[in-house]
Amino acid sequence: MLTPVVSYSTVKEVKGPLLVIERTRGVAYGEIGEVVGPDGEPRRVQVIEVGTDYAVAQVLGGTLGLPAKGSTVRFYGKTLKLPVSEELIGRILDGKGQPRDHMPLPPPEDFRDVNGEPLNPYSREYPEEPIETGISAIDGLYTLVRGQKLPIFSGTGLPHNLMAAQVVRQSTVRGSEEGFAVVFVGVGIKTEEAIFFMDEFRKTGALRRAVAVLNLASDPVAERILAPRVGLTIAEYLAWQLGYHVLVVITDMTNYCEGLRELSSGRGELPGRRGYPGYMYTDLATIYERAGKARGKKGSVTQFPILTMPHDDITHPIPDLTGYITEGQLVLSRSMWGKGIYPPFDVIMSLSRLAKDAIGEGKTREDHKDVANTLISAYSKALELRNLATLVGERNLGWRERRYLRFADAFEQRFIKQGYYERRSFEETLDIGWDVMSILPEDELTNARPQITQKFYRRHIFESIKL
């Protein structure tokens, strides 16, 4: 039980989720406390701005029914710390780290600051080991790497929630003696989405190795800002103290940024691009930069955040700033989804900057780089030929060009498309890749090494296709 250091009855204003407290002395940024209204109910607060004689605090429990007059704020002289334990695996929490599954919290093994402990840049290790998600488009083309931060850029109505649940259920680290865990963070999600995730995790057994932090759209906006930090604090404890490889899946970071804009507006700050605060880049970096590997530590923290692009605009400040901080992006395509292809990846717009160092012999398979480079290059050429075919007609194209059109169809329907409950290993993904690539003549596979093509090319597939 914390003992108050100082109390104030000088609440000037309650503005949205914020309290403005006058005549404060010695109150620190990030300090926690509680506000007690005339009804006697305590609510947790955290200081987010400090002036010469005032402080602004966000109320984590919401300000409904809380008047300025008659309210008392008590500060504890400490920052917000989260009780953590290995026994949190299998639990469902809210955005403040409190139980949402109606069970008591396990005895804490440690208390960790929710703002994290920044990794010394010198102690960081370069990520080089893959995570197998079981999804061919990710594993085959844009491999997720332990310690990487690789976001999904989605849009309203696209199946990013299905993908998040599938990644939580299927992801694994092969050939590692350390444990593997998933921390799932739902930020500002609707009640039906929360029910979907909870039911899915319980039904498939994914919760046995996962911690779920669910912040609902109806929860206070201040909790929305806290939820990703709660999830990452748990992930860091599992990784740095217990040696787990932790995959953190966060959805939806757009809701987080909207909450940030709401708090900024409530504080009367000058808006930046499209009304978002000018410090949004820095704020996002405090979340994304908590991913990584550290020298001397067995574990790792990998981030897989998901955001919905407003109006499918990839130049919007949220995806734009996210792209500057993270190491690539996986973009979902509305046109692919319209064709009935799941997961609907936009292969050309997607990128993983670290994938090249985590694949190949001794990590996945010797032909992995050849397959990835060839598939992307051939598909890019096939899309150009599709556009040409709409102008001149497919029958007016040469036989090689028609092969590319057949390749594009097979690539989308066999390689990219897979079932929601279908899990593919790296080997299965690469074998499907060769099946699809073998539709093309062998001399067209110029992005693959000759010795690799000679070993894996399926000539019988090429010969079986009649144009």
UniProtKB/Swiss-Prot annotation:
It is a peripheral membrane protein. Keywords: ATP synthesis, Cell membrane, Hydrogen ion transport, Ion transport, Membrane, Transport. Its main location: membrane. GO terms for cellular component: plasma membrane. Pfam families: ATP-synt_ab (PF00006), ATP-synt_ab_N (PF02874), ATP-synt_VA_C (PF22919). It is found in: Cell membrane. One of its GO terms (biological process) is proton motive force-driven plasma membrane ATP synthesis. Residues 95-114 are annotated as: Disordered. CDD domains: ATP-synt_V_A-type_beta_C, ATP-synt_V_A-type_beta_N, V_A-ATPase_B. GO terms for molecular function: ATP binding; proton-transporting ATP synthase activity, rotational mechanism; proton-transporting ATPase activity, rotational mechanism. InterPro entries: ATP-synt_VA_C, ATPase_F1/V1/A1_a/bsu_N, ATPase_F1/V1/A1_a/bsu_nucl-bd, P-loop_NTPase, V-ATPase_su_B/beta. HAMAP family: ATP_synth_B_arch (MF_00310). Component of the A-type ATP synthase that produces ATP from ADP in the presence of a proton gradient across the membrane. The B chain is a regulatory subunit. Belongs to the ATPase alpha/beta chains family. Has multiple subunits with at least A(3), B(3), C, D, E, F, H, I and proteolipid K(x). This is A-type ATP synthase subunit B. It comes from Pyrobaculum neutrophilum (strain DSM 2338 / JCM 9278 / NBRC 100436 / V24Sta).
